[in-house]
Amino acid sequence: MSRSSEDKQIEIYEFIKEQIIEKGYPPSVREICKGVGLSSTSSVHGHLSKLEKKGLIRRDSTKPRTIEILKEPIVPKEMVNIPILGKVTAGTPILAVENIEDTFPISLNFIPSNKDLFMLKISGESMIDAGILDGDLAIIEKTNTAKNGEIVVALIDNEVTLKRFFKEDKHIRLQPENKNMDPIILEDDSVSIVGKLAGIFRRY
């Protein structure tokens, strides 16, 4: 093995450790590419395979972001597993999946402390002008109240939707953040707030 190849493996190994310590979870292959200055994901896969053969890391090929450091203990910053409850349509509401699909580990540094949180998958484009895109994971703080202008998860006839909330004279207005879409106007007693937006996670 050339010295440059071995040096690159050391650099990748150290980058993975730093990311786990900083974020609490390992980087993706593309993030490793960017972090160590490689343009080819296949090169990164090759280096990871060699690190795995050396017993320095362990991977699960069936799951993303499952690189585990084996040779030395890494203590990530305090973490919490947020349940992913299903899919919320940012457009036409669809029936929400109430059971937990998965959990997502995230450092407490990146979320509000002492809050009851869950995540929902975004599908649709009604919130694109607020920077919320199809495929995003929305981090939601559980609450049944909201102030005007806050982005909320609203329950309508056992369906959920993500919109900006406005309580007006005789109704509730759920406003999309897409100039091509109309607001949803509802009677006060026909909509319930189940949470408000605390953050967005996006995979690139």
Swiss-Prot record:
EC top class named in words: hydrolase
CDD domains (UniProt xref): HTH_ARSR, S24_LexA-like
A GO biological process held by the record: DNA repair
Keywords from the named record: Autocatalytic cleavage, DNA damage, DNA repair, DNA replication, DNA-binding, Hydrolase, Repressor, SOS response, Transcription, Transcription regulation
Active site: 126 (for autocatalytic cleavage activity), 163 (for autocatalytic cleavage activity)
Catalytic activity: Hydrolysis of Ala-|-Gly bond in repressor LexA
Pfam families xrefs: LexA_DNA_bind (PF01726), Peptidase_S24 (PF00717)
HAMAP family: LexA
NCBIfam families: lexA
Family statement drawn from the similarity comment of this UniProt entry: Belongs to the peptidase S24 family.
Subunit structure, as described in the record: Homodimer.
Protein name stated in the entry: LexA repressor
Organism from which the protein derives: Clostridium novyi (strain NT)
Gene that specifies this protein: lexA
